[in-house]
Amino acid sequence: MKDIESKRRRKLLLLGGALAAQACLPMRVTRALTLPPLPPLPPLPPLPPLPPVPPVPILPPLLDLLKRFTASIVPVPNNPYFVPQGGPVAVPPPAGAPFSGTGLPGSASQSSTLVLYDTTGPWGWLGEIYATMAGNLASHFGAWVAMPVVSYTAGTLQQYSACIYIGSTYGEPLPAAFLTDVYAATTNVIWIYDNIWQLTASQPQFAARYGFMPWVFDTSPVATVTYKSQSVRRYSANAAGIMSYSSIGAPATVLAECVRADSTTFPWAVRSGNFTYIGEIPFAYMTEGDRYLILCDLLFDALAPTTATQHRALVRLEDLHPLSDPTALLQAAEWLFSNGIPFGFHITARYLDPNGYYNDGVPQDVPLHTQPLMIAAIRTMQLLGGVMMHHGYTHQYSNIANPYTAVTGDDCEFYRITASNGVLTYVGPLPEDTDSSWAQGRFDSYAAELSASTFTMPQISTFPAYSASVPDYQAAAQTFAARAERTLYFPGVLTNQTIDYTRPAGQYVPYSVQDAYGSKVLPDTLGGIDPDVFFNIPPRLPADIIADAQRTLVVRDGVASFFYNPEDPLSYLQQTVQGLLDLGYQFVSPLDV
């Protein structure tokens, strides 16, 4: 592998300017080794604590720049994990039949949730996306059913422990039976955003009964929402508007408040009895430490109110492959072990540089079984309590840029993504990816390479770059016990229509769920430590991770999950782990979440 430092410089230049390039941190150059196989390792004695590793100095001007860059939410063009992608449609698809989602096995409450969503108009496809996300969250507590609100029939609501209605289409024609049942319900109801005025108009005693009256949308810039005495973030350029109120008083309770730029406030979420109203859609412009976490916590009130508060944390070592530096991996693993921190680690089984991008134009193909030192490092990490995770067979695709270099670790393996002028475009499935057999073939090749390296198939998978097609996700559900990642969802999944890959949307979850693809999904709430820009994700330093972990405390049974690449200074890992411990988080194994 050639000139890896320039690889990092290439990423930094996406920040914009030569100043950023000065911050390149040294990285170890590794080569394919041809040594005889090592004998099995004996059990290791407990390791003494490692001395603290001093931080690697970074130019102060650049460090200040990075802090400013991450002090507020940075919009990422064409990033489906920030906001659903795609414009209006000329003809909305048919509403579709109800979708039944499986609850997370072993969930404490085994409640049932009815998710109702909008479908009409050119933006009707958003309703299905938001319903998918709401259903995923509800699966933490039990089974769920999603259906278009226009298909609602009288009495349906009372068959469930709770109902979530997501008003994403202004003026959706809500059935009178739905409005009547909501007003008469003893079931917990969470109403999100639009069309609340249809309920108030249908029930003249609404204000007297509930103690509040929605008024107009307030479009003031709001960057902060307060909840449980904690401030969480909101993308202030989101000008869709948040509902304000003409009156509010007993018996209503303000659960969360928006903070305008002039420090004045107004309600973000209100509850009265069994009825909770949220004045905007939390799934749009979602990021780490976001007001989306408030909804995630409010679901406990509706579905599992006796849940005890606990705050757990996960850490995983990211993007390990046959040419990773074994010394750096073991340094991180030994420090975690010596401090009693369980961890996971990603393994990509085969390193490919098909065009010699980092090797003077000479192609490289390095399978794991040819690297005895890396094999020994992996076995040692397992002895130290590390949990291996699948992270792609090659973590790249063919010999084309997808989207960058065609090299393992840089590119996507299960989805076509292009890059132009620093903007990523999520194109869709790869040409061969027509059904689940293609992804299953990649999984089988991965398992064969691990077997040749004396390892068994991991129980947990993370798709490279958090990107895959619907058949790929479905294949993963049949192959792995869980996925640990953020996930792409598409119109057509709930409605059993043709999948619309032009409108992807991403979601992270703060607790384990059983998602719409049928997989258990582990939390990935904080992203990773990375002083660079890569895949158009802004730099994130330990202070950023810790700040968002503090915001994540608003979820009473939430998990703070982050990843660390051993190519970066060990001090980054140490600072972040200690910061989460100081906040009261307890680190657990990925197998125990």
Each language-model region and where it sits:
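Non-catalytic propeptide/linker segments at domain boundaries
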Residues: 89, 96, 266-312
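Catalytic grooves of carbohydrate-active enzymes
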Residues: 304-305, 312-322, 326, 437-460, ...
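Metal-dependent polysaccharide deacetylase catalytic core of the NodB/CE4 family, i.e.
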Residues: 114-116, 197-198, 342-470, 493, ...
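N-terminal secretory signal peptides
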Residues: 1-11, 17-25, 29-31
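Aromatic-Pro/Gly-enriched surface loop or interdomain linker
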Residues: 73-159, 309, 336-339, 345
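A glycine-rich, often tryptophan-bearing local segment used as a flexible ligand/cofactor-contacting loop or short
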Residues: 165, 169-236
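C-terminal domain-boundary segment and adjacent tail
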Residues: 143-147, 297-309, 327, 331-354, ...
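Catalytic beta-strand/loop cores that center a nucleophilic Ser/Cys/Thr
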Residues: 220-274, 280
